[in-house]
Amino acid sequence: MTQPTLFLTVGLPATGKTTAARRLEVDHHALRLTKDEWMKALYGEQNPPSASDVIEGRLIDIGLRAIELGNNVVIDFGLWGRDERSALRQAAADRGARVTMLYFEVSPGEQRRRLDQRQTDVPHTTWPISDEERMVWAAVMQVPTSGEITGSEAIDDPPTGFATWDVWRRDRWPPSVG
């Protein structure tokens, strides 16, 4: 069996993550796990934050099981936090998988243009995003280092209070709502 790859798409909304994830899905025969598609299917116009984390966690569990079975997987969430990326890098390593991290960035003007175009062309696949939300999210985004992207940088230790990245992952992405 060949070594599976976990592809991580990293970036803010409308930067090209899902477009790239769809290409990776086909080119690498990968299971693509795109949170927004699941949120829309399950919640429609609603976008409850409590459900978002649970859906991400369930999709991660599915993706990690697929890796254990030897399949390539694309996690298409944004992964704005370094801890999120470290937890997934460690989970992949624990399962003998490679990680390919792809970071996507566009100018704020291009992002706004893409968001508006998406809202016009395929409103059923997205939610309206205000400029205020974009600015808040950009401030929260922890841009990956070049070492994170290439894999040459060691995976950080889990944050204080967490013995392992698996324990942190279960806390970050809870198994159920509530």
Per-segment meaning from a language model:
Residues 37-39, 80, 105-111, 160:
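Conserved nucleotide-binding/hydrolysis micro-motifs of P-loop NTPases
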Residues 9:
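Hydrophobic anchor at the beta1->P-loop junction of P-loop NTPases
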Residues 93-144:
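A glycine- and Lys/Arg-enriched "phosphate-lid" helix/loop adjacent to the NTP-binding pocket
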Residues 1-3, 66:
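Phosphate-binding P-loop
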Residues 27, 139-178:
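NTP-dependent small-molecule kinase module
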Residues 15-71:
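Conserved substrate/cofactor phosphate-moiety recognition/catalytic segment
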Residues 51-99, 103-105:
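Glycine-rich phosphate-binding loop used to anchor ATP phosphates in small-molecule kinases
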Residues 12:
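P-loop (Walker A) phosphate-binding loop of NTP-binding proteins
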